[in-house]
Amino acid sequence: EMCIRDRQYPVPEEIKTLKAERDAEIADVITGKSDKLLVIIGPCSADNETAVLDYTSRLVKVQEKIKDKVIIIPRVYTNKPRTTGVGYKGMLHQPDPEKKPDLLAGLVAIRKMHIDVMKETHLSPADEMLYPENYWYLSDVLSYVAVGARSVENQQHRLVCSGIDVPAGTVSYTH
């Protein structure tokens, strides 16, 4: 039986196939079967889909030139961790910066943006796992997960990362 995520916000079959191929290629790098390099690249915040699609489209041109040596994974980081909890927290919390926060609309918006990146560029994205409980909602659209400096020592983040099917990287510690 299909879950609500897959019924309401499905990933097209061709994107599922693309992601599986990219995940296998990335796994080959991680396990040493491939001598390519992985490059996770892009801005620290993705809160405007038009801008994200613009820069990821530019990355496609670079990827084509270096495809024999490098796999580019675009950073599409949809959360903004805040040390004090004050300030814009990213697209997940507030998909429209001109409106009030709306977490449900944010979940839909970030899922849509990740799917659109794959549809338009054939690059499978990375996102930061600020909230481990949200990983399931994006698990079928991400090829890399980052754990940020504020979360890297958190047990829940470590447990979730140990059970996911894509590479998880950590950002520098806070000390």
Place the predicted regions along the sequence by residue.
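Conserved small/polar residues in nucleotide/adenosyl-binding loops
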Residues: 2-6, 174-175
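N-terminal glycine-rich phosphate/pyrophosphate-binding loops that anchor nucleotide-derived ligands
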Residues: 5-29
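Generic structural signal for well-ordered alpha-helices
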Residues: 23, 56-60, 111-114, 157
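N-terminal glycine-rich anion-binding loops that anchor highly charged ligand groups
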Residues: 25-39
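Conserved, mostly hydrophobic/aromatic
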Residues: 42
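Glycine-rich anion/phosphate-binding loops
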Residues: 47-63, 102-110
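Short helix-capping segments at alpha-helix termini
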Residues: 64-68
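Active-site-facing alpha/beta catalytic cores
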Residues: 69-175
